[in-house]
Amino acid sequence: MMDFLKRFFGSSQERILKRFQKLVEEVNACDEKFSSLSDDELREKTPQLKQRYQDGESLDKLLPEAYGVVKNVCRRLAGTPVEVSGYHQQWDMVPYDVQILGAIAMHKGFITEMQTGEGKTLTAVMPLYLNALTGKPVHLVTVNDYLAQRDCEWVGSVLRWLGLTTGVLVSGSPPEKRKAIYQCDVVYGTASEFGFDYLRDNSIATRKEEQVGRGFYFAIIDEIDSVLIDEARTPLIISGPGEKHNPVYFELKDRVAELVYFQREMCNHIAIEARKVLDPFLGTDVLPKDKKVMEAISEACRALWLVSKGMPLNRVLRRVREHPDLRAMIDKWDVFYHAEQNKEECLEKLSSLYIVVDEHNNDFELTDKGMLQWIEKIGGAAEDFVMMDMGHEYALIEEDATLSPADKLNRKIAVSEKDTQRKARAHGLRQLLRAHLLMEKDIDYIVRDDQIVIIDEHTGRPQPGRRFSEGLHQAIEAKEHVTIRKESQTFATVTLQNFFRLYEKLAGMTGTAITESREFKEIYSLYVLQVPTFKPCLRIDHNDAFYMTEREKYQAIVAEIISAHRSGKPILIGTESVEVSEKLSRILRQNRINHTVLNAKNHAQEAEIIAGAGKVGAVTVATNMAGRGTDIKLDEEAVAAGGLYVIGTSRHQSRRIDRQLRGRCARLGDPGAAKFFLSFEDRLMRLFASPKLNTLIRHFRPPEGEAMSDPMFDRLIETAQKRVEGRNYTIRKHTLEYDDVMNKQRQTIYAFRNDVLHAEDLFVVAKEQIEHVALALAFLILKDAHADHCSLPKIEEWLSYSFPVKLDDQEIRRLGDVDAVADYIGDLLIEAFDVKFSAMLAEFTEIIGSAANAQGICNDILRSVIISHIDEEWKVHLVDMDLLRSEVGLRSVGQKDPLIEFKNESFLLFEGLIRDIRIAIVKHLFALELSLTRSDRPDNAIPTVATAFHNHDNFRPMELTIVGEEEES
């Protein structure tokens, strides 16, 4: 029925494209009409369109004329030189109808899927121009600094011709320049640059003049699937050095390495013994029928199953798994031990290991044997695995009648510190084990200049400046014997998902979005529109070639490269990691094939390498970093030879990454071909393939070195990729659900902070905080007054110590009502505040000689006090929230929903945060002691003093001393 309706009415995509096609015709009509205008008359269209918008016309109504103006400018610029990245290039682009179609979709808030080489960069200029007419912030988000700079210089020339200003944000841009850049009509930059500026404006800036942004109206995200999906699990974090250096990584690194060594040696021994049994059969296609021999083979495979749980990448294990029947027997034991009735036997077998590694879920578990080895042979402590029951410990202290109240307090503090140290040690131990067992050099990270540099798993690019969280980075530093740096403390954080929700309008463009259309719709309310190509795609997509082993796969890849190289075709070989790219490079060198390698270790030459990758006879080995934002342009000889030949050395866990690699060839009607070479030892196949795989392998098993190719295998790959994509989507959605809780708190704190930064009269803000504190105290006093053991005297003692006021017990009892008591306490505190700061203001005025400047100084002091306490308490709150997030997962054991638990407890934490901020501010205001002392200068220096205060620049003539409560105590 649905198919019939689609044939009759067309799909939703077709209906949208048909509707937009009418607008394309209007745009072309406007372009033709504007051809008769002079350059000055065409430029004048920009202020005219701006005025019409201000007069009430909608952008939708202005769209045909605005897009027509842009198209006409592109036509006029044809043949003119534009300087891009230091080179002069001739402008040669005029928007096609399909590009105008994509531009309309982006203005309407769609994600446009346009194939490689279809001109996404030029397409974006039209909606950027239209939305910039509003005068509101318009941003183009790219995946790296190079593309941001290039796009601003290249297509930004159209916007500048029309009188708009453009700016580009790159890493290292100083704050004073950033402020000017954000004032431009259109700003180009990466997601991290925009995101970090947002965090800095709301967590680092201490004056409104230090804030650089001007809001969020419209953004187009280039390669939107990379930004909002691939990087969605990695939050933007502003952090600084932690207050304390955790020595546990240095102390335990050698012991952990020793434990992992014991595990490796034990697994190697088991594997070697198993191979002695299996060696005679590794070169045969059929296993013997003898029952005793088969029992021995089965037991050897059982032993290798155990090895797979201890060292999944063991060489003997990988070699044996090349044999389809033996592979099936190992997997059969895996199925056997997963059955509920065999769980006890499974645990017994696993207990013979020191550590059980779960490669599928990227986790591990220390066994009892491993703990015993740690304690008895390696020199660890039993306390490393036993956490303290703080409730029990505190109860024992309270029951000890020999201790005074002060001794009990000191004992509790000591126990708490001991618990903290023990937890830190246990956490460090676990992270060191994770670094050794699950993090691989040249796959997850590289070592460069005595530092660990993260490799982005999706792009293959290095991420200098980024660090793994929760001590994992320090653990890897310890593992690789580089300098172990301090753990960082988070000052501010936001996920890209929630950052881009700040924009009123959001659109995107990419060559690969349709496979993730569900996620874009459910999380971002963005719909994907596939835009037709300008010219038919001539790419030849060969069937995947499957090989039994990795060794056979690489032999076939090299043979294919040699064959294609002889024909003169440029070849791009895509690899999944630095390790694989270097391995393939070694093989090519052995075969004397000249080639270039592009990976995280030499990414600085990316533009140069890509520029030469389309020349006849070029061979380029690249990680996924060559998959985005780079068009490989062919020379004439390369086109004649058949175009770019893309070879994939494995399938990525995401179908999009594979499509991106294919998309490097056959751009804009060029010839090209793509082929993937796979083995059943590839990570995707090993971890996520269907259980039916062994049956297929045994049925289709070819002779040594021959490939298998069948639609059934293609479906197998797609199923595995969908399984991984589904898992990753669940993780991203789960992350967002938790971050949504944090996001509401973040917005509340940032709004409060911004109100303080922009407030004209900080005395009013300070008094508001005093009133809130008074209300909290009133609740506390009246709640305590109705309790069985009233401790009102203790509250009054604390109050008189913190604030210069004394409460009247009889007055409080007479009032009785919370609001009345709050007003009573508030009046006392505000009166004391007025007395204190009126005297201070009078003193400043007398010294400076200007009441206005004295008022400005007091405002700045109050602002500084309030902002500092917001920031300090927020940092502590972020740590508390991280701890809560890590703890609530265990609540599921007690049949509780961790997310609901997190929401409930985070609300209580946030209430406590607001209370703590207000109390800290008010206590500091009353503890503050300020004095201005004249410098040893003649009286004629006083006017300069006033100017210095007014400008708040480089304070010299007078000294300002701030004494807080910590210093007093």
Swiss-Prot record:
Q: Which reaction does it catalyse?
A: ATP + H2O + cellular proteinSide 1 = ADP + phosphate + cellular proteinSide 2
For this entry, the protein name equals: Protein translocase subunit SecA
- A Pfam family annotated for this chain is SecA_PP_bind
Annotated keywords: ATP-binding, Cell inner membrane, Cell membrane, Cytoplasm, Membrane, Nucleotide-binding, Protein transport, Translocase, Translocation, Transport
Sites binding ATP sit at 99, 117-121, 631
Could you give one GO CC term from the UniProt record?
cytosol
Q: How does it assemble?
A: Monomer and homodimer. Part of the essential Sec protein translocation apparatus which comprises SecA, SecYEG and auxiliary proteins SecDF. Other proteins may also be involved.
- Translocase listed as a keyword: yes
- The top EC class is translocase
Function statement: Part of the Sec protein translocase complex. Interacts with the SecYEG preprotein conducting channel. Has a central role in coupling the hydrolysis of ATP to the transfer of proteins into and across the cell membrane, serving as an ATP-driven molecular motor driving the stepwise translocation of polypeptide chains across the membrane.
Which EC number(s) are documented for this chain? 7.4.2.8
Instruction: Name where it mostly resides.
Output: membrane
Per its record, what are the GO molecular function terms? ATP binding; protein-exporting ATPase activity
Q: Does the keyword Transport apply?
A: yes
What SMART domains is this protein classified in? SecA_DEAD, SecA_PP_bind
Q: Which GO terms describe its biological process?
A: intracellular protein transmembrane transport; protein import; protein targeting; protein transport by the Sec complex
Q: Which family does it belong to?
A: Belongs to the SecA family.
What membrane topology does the annotation report for this chain?
Peripheral membrane protein
Q: Which NCBIfam families match?
A: secA
What does the UniProt entry say about where the protein is found?
Cell inner membrane; Cytoplasm
